[in-house]
Amino acid sequence: MITNVMVDFLTYRGFDEIYVPNIQMAETFNGKVGPENNNMMYTFTDRGNRNLCLAPEYTAVIQTLADTAYKNEKDVKLFYELECFRGEKPQAGRYRQFTQFGVEILNPTKDYYGEMIADAAEMIARCGVDDYIVDTNVVRGLDYYEDKQGFEIRCERLGSSKQLCGGGKYEGGIGFAIGLDRLMLVSKLGE
């Protein structure tokens, strides 16, 4: 139900769903996801001796599409719902496998920053969370964000892992991701 609310909202706003594989080249994330996330990646070598990983997040993957598949297109509006994998200590609201719902605009022709923050907040509100806090002046731990600046939406009811959503501008685009597992913990939909 939560996913349907977000998909309906984004489809109405002109976004298209994209699917990308969970297994990625490990180098896709080098120098982009920060040293902490690099250390938590599940990596392995395949039969072709390529260094692969289970994707720890997807903005870095989508960012490469701005330079390749969508190189000649502007204002490409995409969303995705994909599984992420991180070798971190499981605790309340933090899992080794979790679902990321991401929203990206590739090769933007205008500054969508405020619009993306408003969309993220609106989606969270439509999912039955009314006690969220928007922080538009956050230093993000992911190296692909411009000046490491970004935004977060938090819910205090989640305790120490209170971030519901994070995003910002990066070379070739702007976007945010919502942790669906955390959103389900605080959503009033289905009560």
Regions found by a protein language model. Give the residues of each.
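TRNA-recognition modules of translation machinery and tRNA-sensing kinases, especially anticodon-binding
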Residues: 1-191
